[in-house]
């Protein structure tokens, strides 16, 4: 079995790390460069940087901040937010990103997935999906969860895989920031239908939640923000807990 990955996420707004509940009520959580360095030193497997205002405000991800974070970490680094064309990808990879996460832009222009995979390789392309469970399944949302689309979670992620996405980062909007556990049932469905890795996001509150994402949700990686930013869970302790639960971690 491949080792499971633990991934802290930096949600960036106006150059600062923030964390909200159900995608609203944002509060500040610290300097992204300092946090990135700390997570890298603590043994995080990867780092995700999402400029949560970039798509909404129609501006480009702040490449200079990406460059500063990349210079301070020694782990793979995924960047998302406001990436609409290949030149955006090129600029961020040059700034030090290892992978690019696309969300709203991929829904609006699915061909972007094909183009990134073709020009830079599937391993660079992470499809991020913000989805909410309603009476009729899981619906995908645009612009940081502000706009509902007609895309359904399973069909959209399957299409993205076929177009060349190398990973899926699935955030449950129902679970985000609530700290009651990940959307394990939906995760397990995605894991069973996709051949690319699935990253669980939204809902981590306790160490058991990470265990459940891996055992029940069959996720390949688990992403979290506030539990790490506010020191509620420490990465070395989380990894030794998971080891004790029989889960292979790096």
From Swiss-Prot:
IGPS catalyzes the conversion of PRFAR and glutamine to IGP, AICAR and glutamate. The HisF subunit catalyzes the cyclization activity that produces IGP and AICAR from PRFAR using the ammonia provided by the HisH subunit. Its main location: cytoplasm. It is found in: Cytoplasm. One of its GO terms (cellular component) is cytoplasm. It comes from Bacteroides fragilis (strain ATCC 25285 / DSM 2151 / CCUG 4856 / JCM 11019 / LMG 10263 / NCTC 9343 / Onslow / VPI 2553 / EN-2). Keywords: Amino-acid biosynthesis, Cytoplasm, Histidine biosynthesis, Lyase. NCBIfam families: hisF (TIGR00735). GO terms for biological process: L-histidine biosynthetic process. It is an enzyme of class 4 (lyase). Belongs to the HisA/HisF family. Heterodimer of HisH and HisF. The active site is at residues 11, 130. It comes from the Bacteria. One of its GO terms (molecular function) is lyase activity. Its EC number is 4.3.2.10. It catalyses: 5-[(5-phospho-1-deoxy-D-ribulos-1-ylimino)methylamino]-1-(5-phospho-beta-D-ribosyl)imidazole-4-carboxamide + L-glutamine = D-erythro-1-(imidazol-4-yl)glycerol 3-phosphate + 5-amino-1-(5-phospho-beta-D-ribosyl)imidazole-4-carboxamide + L-glutamate + H(+). This is Imidazole glycerol phosphate synthase subunit HisF. Pathway: Amino-acid biosynthesis; L-histidine biosynthesis; L-histidine from 5-phospho-alpha-D-ribose 1-diphosphate: step 5/9. The gene is hisF.
């Amino acid at each position: 079995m491949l080792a499971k990955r633990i991934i802290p996420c930096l949600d960036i707004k106006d150059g600062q790390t923030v964390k909200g509940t159900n995608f609203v009520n944002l509060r500040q959580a610290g300097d992204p460069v300092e946090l990135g360095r700390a997570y890298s030193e603590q043994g995080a497997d990867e780092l995700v940087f999402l400029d949560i205002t970039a798509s909404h405000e129609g501006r480009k991800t702040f490449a200079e901040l990406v460059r500063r974070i990349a210079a301070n970490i020694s782990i793979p680094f995924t960047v998302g937010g406001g990436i609409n064309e290949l030149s955006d990808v090129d600029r961020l990879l040059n700034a030090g990103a290892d992978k690019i996460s696309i969300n709203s832009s991929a829904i609006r222009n699915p061909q972007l997935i094909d183009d990134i995979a073709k020009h830079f390789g599937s391993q660079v392309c992470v499809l991020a999906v913000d989805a909410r469970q309603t009476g009729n399944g899981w619906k995908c949302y645009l612009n940081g969860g502000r706009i509902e689309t007609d895309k359904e979670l399973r069909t959209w992620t399957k299409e993205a895989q076929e177009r060349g996405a190398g990973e899926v980062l699935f955030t449950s909007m129902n679970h985000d920031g609530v700290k009651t556990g990940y959307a394990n049932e939906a995760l397990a469905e995605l894991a069973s239908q996709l051949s690319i890795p699935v990253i669980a996001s939204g809902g981590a509150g306790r160490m058991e939640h990470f265990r459940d994402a891996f055992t029940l949700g069959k996720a390949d990686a688990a992403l979290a923000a506030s539990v790490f930013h506010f020191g509620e869970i420490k990465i070395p302790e989380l990894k030794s807990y998971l080891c004790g639960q029989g889960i292979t971690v790096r």
